[in-house]
Amino acid sequence: MEDFVFGTLATDNLKLLHHRTRRRGIQHAYQIEPRDPKPDEPITLSVTIGPHLKPARVVCHLNGELLDFEKREMLWDTLVWGYVEKWTLTLAGKPDGTVIRYRISAIEADGRETFADFPEVQTSIEIATSAFFRGESLPDLQPGDRAKGNAFALSVDTLTPPEWAKHAVIYQVFVDRFFPGKGNDWKQPDDLLGFFGGTLWGVIEKLDYIEDLGVNCIWLSPIFDSPSHHGYDATDIYNVAERYGGNEALHALVDAAHARRIRILLDFVCSHISDEHPVFADAHANEDSLYRDWFSFDDSEVGYRSFFGSPRMPQLDYTNPAARKWMIDAARYWIREFDVDGYRLDYAIGPTPDFWTDFWLGCKAEKADSFCFGEVIDAPDVQKHYVGRLDGCLDFFSADALRRTYGFKTWDEAHLERFLERHAAYFTDDFIMPTFLDNHDMDRLLFLNGGDKDALKKAAQTQMHLPGPPLIYYGTEVGLTHEKSSQEGGGIHVSRVPMVWGHGQDQDLLDFYKKIIAERKLRK
C-alpha cells in the first residue's frame, strides 16, 4: 500500500515531469540570495535557461527599467538531456520596508520574448497528477503562455516569525468531528461525507481537556460557510457557518482560549473557493461580470482552472488586483475583528508567487506576531521558496519519514535518524516547520501499523524531539483510528471519524502524550 503523502510527486514519472518542467524554458522560481533580504543587503536573483531556449539577453523588469542578467554557469542535466544555463543579477540593497516587484524575461535574437516562469510548472503538475489519480496516462506538457509569465515580489524587512510559534504545541481540530456541545448528541449521517454536528461551542467545552493535554495552540479546520463537511470550498469568507455556531461562537472561543494562553489559528483557503460562491456563480454565468477576470476560464473539460480539475473548486487568479485585495482583506479582517493568531494556509503552492508576499505583510500589519504557515506538498527546495514570504511550512518530509519508520515499517531507525539530521540542517531556524504524524487527508498512523501502540509512542517521542513545533491531529493521542484505508476505496476522508470521549479513550496513550509534551516544554 502506498501512502501518497506527496500526491504531485507520487510516482517516478511525476517526479521526472516535475524535474524536467523546472529545467525547461526560463525558470526563476524565487532563486534569491539571501532568501529573506534585510535592509541594505545586496540581493542576487538567478534564473535557469533550458536547452531549447537561446536568449540574446535575460532582463529584469524593475520600476520601468530593464536590468541585464549575466550568464554565469553551464550545467549538464541528464534528465532533460541537455545543457542548462544559469544567469544572475545582483541588485543593490534596499531600505527597510521596500517591496521589490519585478518580472524576468529572456529575449532571443529575433526579438521573441519569454517571461519567467515558462513553462508554467504548477499547472502542468496539477493536470498530470489529476490524470494519474484517475488512472490515465500522463498528458503532454502544458506550456502555457510564454508572454504571460509570473510577477514576483520580495519584501526587504526585519520581520521574523513569532517567537511563540517556536514553542507551540499545536492541536488540529476538525470541527465537525470534535464535539457537538450544548448537550447535543452526534448526528448520524450515512457516511463520513455527511455532517456529524461538531461545533465551536463544543470546542469551548473541551478547552479543559486541550489545556490539560499541554496544548497551547489550536488549529481549526475551515469554519466558513460551505456546502461540504470539510469546508475547503467556501461560499462566504466573511462569516462562520451557523452549523458551527456562527461568528458569536468564534468570538467566544478566541476569548476563552486566550484566557488560558492558548492561541487560535484558522484554516484559510486562498487557492480556491466553492463553485456555489456568489462571486464565481456570477463570473461563470456572465462574461461581462465584474468578477470574470478573477478566474481563469479556458477550453478544458471543466471550463476553468480549478483545484486538481474539480469543478466544485474554481481557483482564483491573483494577477487580478481586485481578487487579490478581496482575499487579503478577508485574512486581515479575521485577525483584526476576531483576534485570531494566524493561519494554516491550504494548498499554498496554488496562488501566484507574489501573492504570499502581500498576504504575509498584510497579516503582520494587523498583528505583528501572527503565525502564517503553508501547506506546501512539494520538494524541500521548493518549500524554501517561501522563506521570507511566510513564517513556515508544514513539515511533510519528517511526517513521511516517521510514517515509513513507525507506520509502514519500511525504514529502520538508523535510516530515520540520518534523514532527520540532514533534513533539519537543510532549513534555517527562522523558518518554522510544524511536524505531524497524520492529518485529515491521510490514514492515521495507528491504522498504518495495524494498531501497534508502541510504534505510535516511538513516533510521538521522536516528533517531540524535532526542531519544529509538534502538531497533533485530534484523537491521535487517545488511539483514534478507522476501518478502511484512504488508498483502498475509503477516500482521503477516512481518518475524519468522530472524536471519542470518556471510556472510549486509551488512557495509557493519553497519559504518555501528556508526559512527552510536558518534557518538550521543559526542554524548550
Protein language model annotation of sequence segments:
Residues 47, 173, 210, 220, ...:
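Conserved, mostly hydrophobic/aromatic
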Residues 127-131, 135, 143, 161-162, ...:
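Core domains of carbohydrate- and sulfate-ester-processing enzymes
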Residues 170, 174-216, 223-337, 358-366, ...:
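Substrate-binding/active-site clefts of carbohydrate-active enzymes
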Residues 176-178, 223-225, 269-271, 348-350, ...:
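Active-site beta-loop-alpha junctions enriched in small/polar residues
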Residues 428-451:
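Active-site clefts of carbohydrate-active enzymes
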